[in-house]
C-alpha cells in the first residue's frame, strides 16, 4: 500500500505512514551479496568517493539488484539510514563515526606523504 520509493515525508514528516517503518537486514543469496559488494567497491573507486558513501539498491521482480542511487555524503545523524545500516552490520554509532574519521585521517596522511 506504500509507494515503492520513499519521498521527503519518509524521512522528515512524523505523521507519514513511513515514519514507523523499521529497517531490517536483507536476506540475500551469497551470489547477490558478492555482486553487491563488488559493484559498490568498483563504483566507489570510479566515482572517486572518499572515506564513506551509501549505495541504495533494490531488487526487481526477478530478484536482480538495481542501483537506486549513490550518496557520497550521507548524513551522520544517529537515526539516519547510514547509522541504521551500520547497526545492521553490528557496528555501533560511535564505532561508525570512528571508522569514517579514521578513513579520512589515513587518506589525508597518505596524500601528504
Residue ranges with predicted function:
Residues 82-95:
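Catalytic phosphate/nucleotide-handling subdomain of diverse soluble enzymes
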Residues 5, 76-81:
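Cytochrome P450 core scaffold surrounding the K-helix E-X-X-R motif
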Residues 44-77, 86:
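Conserved metal-phosphate-binding beta-hairpin within the catalytic cores
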Residues 12-60, 108, 112:
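A long amphipathic alpha-helix within ATP-dependent nucleotide-binding catalytic cores
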Residues 96-113:
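Cysteine/selenocysteine-centered motifs that mediate thiol-based redox chemistry or coordinate metal-sulfur cofactors
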Residues 1-17:
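Anionic-ligand binding region
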